[in-house]
Amino acid sequence: EKGKEILGKI
């Protein structure tokens, strides 16, 4: 899911 990409960004 996109959530993992967001978490990887921070």
Curated annotation (Swiss-Prot):
| Tissue specificity as recorded in UniProt | Expressed by the venom gland.
Gene Ontology cellular-component terms for this entry are: extracellular region
Primary residence? secreted
Q: Which residues form a coiled coil?
A: none
> Where located?
Secreted
Which GO MF terms are attached to this record?
A: toxin activity
Q: Which UniProt keywords apply?
A: Secreted, Toxin
Which species does this protein come from? Tityus obscurus (Amazonian scorpion)
Name of the molecule in the record: Toxin To56
